Amino acid sequence: MKERTVLFVDDEENILRSLKRGLIDEPYKTLFANSGKEALEVLEQEKIHILVTDMRMPEMGGLDLLRIVKERYPDIVRIVLSGYTQVTTLLTAINQGEIYKYITKPWELEEEFKPAIRQAVEYYNSKLSNATV
């Protein structure tokens, strides 16, 4: 099975540092962007399979990023990682961004976060294999 690439997007450096440390031994390639704009630049240069984004970021918020990714890269599995848990925001992300999962901050790395990302990779792989059948 080919290695999959996960792009994590968050404007908080401490979140990205924590993810880099915590995910170093995971069976997928990790890339990081500190804004929606930077994420779009990475998406133009790299083959991304999973996108994990914060919702509240300056300039381009997570919802705008999700909409663009859904339109330009519909095969990417989209996940929200956010401390912003207002129900209307969650429903908008689900409906407009067609997200696979919504993970709230703070998260439990071993019991919640890592398994969720692995499941997203498995989901991507199953979508791919079903498309080729």
Regions found by a protein language model. Name each.
Residues 4, 34-38, 61-64:
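Acidic catalytic/metal-coordinating carboxylates
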Residues 32-50:
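Acidic, metal-coordinating helix/loop segments flanking the phosphotransfer/catalytic sites
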Residues 64, 85-103, 111:
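Alpha4 helix (beta4-alpha4-beta5 surface) of REC/receiver domains from two-component response regulators
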Residues 4, 13-31:
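Two-component/phosphorelay signaling modules centered on CheY-like receiver
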Residues 41, 63-75:
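Short amphipathic alpha-helix used as the core "switch/output" element in two-component signaling
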Residues 10, 54:
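Active-site residues of response regulator receiver
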Residues 57:
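Receiver (REC) domain active-site loop signature in two-component systems and cognate sites
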